[in-house]
Amino acid sequence: MKVSYNWLKQYINCDLSAEEIAKKLTGTGLEVEDLTPYESIKGALKGVVVGKVIYCVDHPNSDHLHITKVDVGAEEPLNIVCGAPNVAEGQKVLVATIGTELHNGNESFTIKKGKIRGEVSEGMICAEDELQIGESHDGIMVLPEDYEVGKPASYYFPVEQDTTIEIGLTANRSDATSHIGVNRDLVAALNYQEKTDKYHLVIPSVDDFKVENTNNDIEVVVEDTKACPRYSGVTVSGVKVGPSPKWLKHRLEAIGLRSINNIVDISNYVLMETGQPLHTFDADKIKGKKVVVKCLEEGTKFVTLDGVERKLSNTNLMICNAEEPMCIAGVFGGAESGVTESTTNVFIESAYFNPTSVRKTSKYHGLQTDASFRFERGCDPNMTLYALKRAALLIKELAGGTISSEIKDVINGDFTPVRVELKFTYLNKIAGQEIEKDIAVNILKNLDCKVVELTDESVTVDVPTCKVDVYRPADLVEEILRIYGYDNIAIPEKINATLNVVAKPDPEKLKRNVSIMLASNGFYEIMNNSLTKEAYTKEMDSFDENRNVKILNPLSSDLNVLRQSLLFGGLKSIENNHNHKIFDIKFFEFGNTYFYDADKKQEGISLSPYTEIYNLDLFITGKDKEELWSNKPQNVDFYELKKYVLGILHKLNIDVEKLETSEGNVKHYEYSLVYSLNGMELCTLGKINQKTLKLFDLKREVYHATMNWDNLLKANKDAKAVRYEPLPKFPAVRRDLALILDKNVNFEQVKNVAFTAENKILTSVSLFDIYTGDKIPEGKKQYALSFILMDTQKTLTDKVIEKTMAKIQSAIEQQLKATLR
């Protein structure tokens, strides 16, 4: 946000430089990002002086140039070649001397001594547009006879010099979106730092405001009282629309605003002065002499000031007359109701619109204006009348006219100040040191907080309604410390704290480690919108549409619910990549999923039926590796995905030997597997079925895993610490078995039986072949298994090995009905 140094000084009795003010403001939390010099005339007419033409003849080598001698008060007159048709001997003129820099928009050039058609020229006799004094270029500017030769041009044509102060305003500081608001902090800081009370915020008086007649009364009706809790307006008749005076133009230009006309400029001036947005209508265009504040039907067409026809939402608050809309409330005016050169009567609007309503409307239309910027953050609802009167008086002063209606002030809300009690012990605790009570109280007073009660233990204040973010004791502490200065809070020499040296799982570190591992294996992380379309849950049998968390005012039907699964976004990302001919894909995504359970609803607890679960999802499709001469890529499959899932579990120090496996019953999978630990489900992985793939126009196989990250962290927390062992001194022995088993027996069952039979010297069991071909009975399959045996204390003998293998074989045969091939 930009403010003007000269403008700030209108309201405060101080002689600080712009740099000093910038330092003070930054100390209060209004961080000054830049200071930029402003000149109402670029270059400030430096090097331009009053001269007198004492000699003028036609140029011998030109049919339009003239050779002149100009007295500029120097020892010798200047020889200047001039092309103006109106130059003549005896004229007083403005001369740009050698070295003067003249500006034309964003371009500039420097006057140099040179020759024009063979004649020496030592300066330039200027037209008014060349000096930015006026707009005429019909000829040179001829001055009155009483102008003194040699005087600087700036003596007769004063240049406004100012400094533009750019403040990086945070979203919570709506009270500082104006010159008065910024000065409020400056006054408080100066009075505290100089231990005085001499600085005061002097706000222009509106006591002269009075209604002169009611000849142009306009009725105001507010239908949507929630979106418009307060609407004020007044009519001024008999105005003359025209250019603004220089002082008003300079104030607006210094902060980057373009002058339009006196009426519009006054609205902008009061906005930047008070922080209260205004809108000025041509009163004669308000049909039916009635202003109605309401929402219109979905799809209603409306042309805004920029000439763009827009379709309205039925939630967009509009300012209408008796027949049609005139303005998008708090955002942008309409093309038909604005002030023009022919306007003679104006209706001034000063309202308080609901911040949420304005924010939604602004985003809906993609419009960000000075008004919406302030309304979105929360304006002062009690500033409407002051701003209205201030604007009306300025219009009378600069455009004439009479105040020709009573003020309409429709109020549908409670705008009494928030009352907050601050205990001094709490202030000192939060500050980290003792702050004198008198200092704290005076700071609050200087910030316009009204002290209601003061005791030795606490102070109770009414917070000004401009401070929409101050409503708790902690907020008052922040207000005090901003002015007190955080740099005045002493840093203690020591900190008394109890340190817990027991290592705890770091969720972010674990997440980062898993992300790095997946990225190292060729995965790309994706981040999808938490909002998705309800149609997915309706078309996929796996999800209950009654559990959707629905958005009350969705931007579109594609973003009307919160996702129940990361699956939707992941498959959409794969679809987008397939459309760009990228088919070999490995994606992972961390994110929340959201559920509504009506059965969990508890009276008085608004969030009770809602649940969030943090998940990690994996997606793989296409080839498993890049195609190179040295290797042949294969299509990814279920076991490829399983490898990555087990790798994540290993990374989280979860003992995969203790995992419980079961067949999944998820309807969007062709087949699936579920991993659990002590009854707690950790992960489901499987192959996406064709019905689901068709929803996303996918024609290639996709494998997907969803992992409950919250449960994984619990399992990690319960996992035993990593145990280090010395390298084995004695050799390991491998023995293989080929077993015929029922088809419904899986490897995990075989493995568990083997370890149950022998858990001392059996170190691992691996499946290296599956065969279901000839000579294998129907309903059976052959597993080729390898068993690794090792004793950490001695070398295994053949006798021990054979005895152990016999025990393992016998257990498998008895418990799983297996036979040796």
Predicted regions and their residues:
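Extended, well-folded interaction surfaces typified by the phenylalanyl-tRNA synthetase beta subunit core
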Residues: 181, 420-585, 735, 788-793, ...
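Phosphate-backbone binding interfaces of nucleic-acid-interacting proteins
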Residues: 1-210, 347, 370, 378-381, ...
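Class II aminoacyl-tRNA synthetase-like tRNA-binding/catalytic domains
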Residues: 114, 292-332, 336-339, 495-612, ...
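Mobile "lid/hinge" segments at catalytic clefts and subdomain interfaces of large enzymes
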Residues: 117-130, 136-142, 154-163, 167, ...
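Terminal amphipathic helices with adjacent charged low-complexity linkers/tails
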Residues: 190-222, 399-427, 433-434
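A carboxyl-terminal module marker
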Residues: 2, 19, 445-449, 460, ...
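Conserved mixed alpha/beta core segments that line enzyme active sites in large multi-domain catalysts
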Residues: 49-80, 150, 249, 254, ...
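Glycine/proline-enriched, intrinsically flexible loops and inter-domain linkers
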Residues: 5, 23, 39-40, 201-300
